[in-house]
Amino acid sequence: MKIISLFFFLGILQVSYSQEAPIIPSPEKPSVTDNILFELKDWDPIRGLWLSESIMAMSTNQVIPDRTFAEELTPYELLSLMPKEKREDLKEYIESNNTGAQTTNNSFTTLLLALINNTFCKTIQGRSYGDPHLKSFDNATYSFQTVGEFELSKSSDRNFEIQARQKAQSDNFSLNSAIAMNVSGDRVGFYAEDAPSRNVTPLFLDGAPIQLQGRTYFLPHGGTIKLNGSNYIITWPTGEILILNNRASGGRNFINVTVTIFECSTQTYSGLLGNANKNINDDFNGRNNNQSPPVYQAFSTFGNPLMQQASIIAEKEYLSYLSQSFADDWRVTDMTTLFDYSNGTNTASFTDRRFPMVHLTVADLNANQQSMARQRCEAMGISLDEMGGCIFDQGYLNIAPNPVPSPSLATEGVVLNKLERPLLNTNTHQILAPKNPSGEAQPKTPSENTIEERPGKTDIKTYENNNTIVKPSQPIQIKVPNNNNKPAPINTNKPINTSPVIPGKNEKPGKG
């Protein structure tokens, strides 16, 4: 009886209290984004936190936080080092749960899913080399002796763009003298010649000269620049790679260009390197796919036996199309250029629509010249699809054969040892890689791990993490969101971040 009376009294008290006390809401169910952030941090408390914050920043076109570990990696590169099973689980979770209702940041999950997909994807390459001979992403090859500034390749989200400046070597030959690019919002220029100001460095970031100081340079929006031999390697935070090989011929400096993108990318591409749609036959149709190339495009400009069946008139007509109508479609304007200019110059200053005066081909070389050039190209391991361009450059300009560069990936040999605490790693504040529990040094990345702090900058910016990551209520098990990404704005001013600006010193043989 006493127990019943006590329960009755407590019941009355509870009803009375519930009528007067405010209702406290129960904790909200963790969102898809919350669960993903938890999983990334659970994988690696320090690197995973930086990775999640970086991808979040990238999804809104913001500057990423400073690295808190010794490895000199982009967000994509770090993600690719995550165990395969973990990446597969995240991919499945995003695809099955991203309905929009639970997702607090669709742009974040969309970008993360794209990055994960790229880690499982093959890459494809486009090239512009020598007196420029171009190979598209779909393996179409052609010769492009023109003068001016051109859109080499551009993605539909406009976070990836590369432009090439071609400069006359003589009346009939031209070379790549400068390359400009948009690296996810950072405007980078590389000038083998005609730099916008007198500096010993060929590199410019948002119009100001920079030096690599013998190590990887971190770009504000997550990309990196490093020097490997004579190759400058620019890596996008999303994984695309540009290799610039700095060379010389006839007293002039020039650049061979190799561009690597993902075969499975959801982006569409435009420019001289084609649309990467696996169709070799539409790479010469112009910007709006509305050009009508001469029928000669079916034949090779360089040494293909079928060329002998084509008339000289048809051949010249084809080359004329490439250097005029096709070229004009891909010229940049004062509104679209990414290049830096000295006072009084603009893109028109580097344009000559009369060029070349005469269209020359391998067929204009005598048999002995062709044979000697071919032998040297073969000895250097030049591939079949670039053989014609190599013979041309050897025969006319004596340019040494240049095989496609294949530097080591930044992730090669990297082991992610456990970190006990964050280690600030910026362009101005460099760190000594921590020791393993065994006392041995961590394995080195392809670039220097041991770095010193440089004088001259004391306002080092650090990022505090105030995010609370909610532990998921159930294991990750992972609907593709709408793409809300906006194109990254190009910064035309000097960046304000921890990156210092330091003044100072299959295969198809084809048409190029």
Task: Please state what every model-predicted region is.
Residues 20-108, 113-424:
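Von Willebrand factor type D
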Residues 414-512:
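Extracytoplasmic low-complexity, disordered linker/stalk tracts in cell-surface/secreted proteins
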Residues 6, 281, 298, 339, ...:
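N-terminal start and proteolytic maturation junction detector
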Residues 14-18:
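Sec/Tat signal peptide C-region and signal peptidase I cleavage site
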Residues 4-12:
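Sec-dependent N-terminal signal peptides
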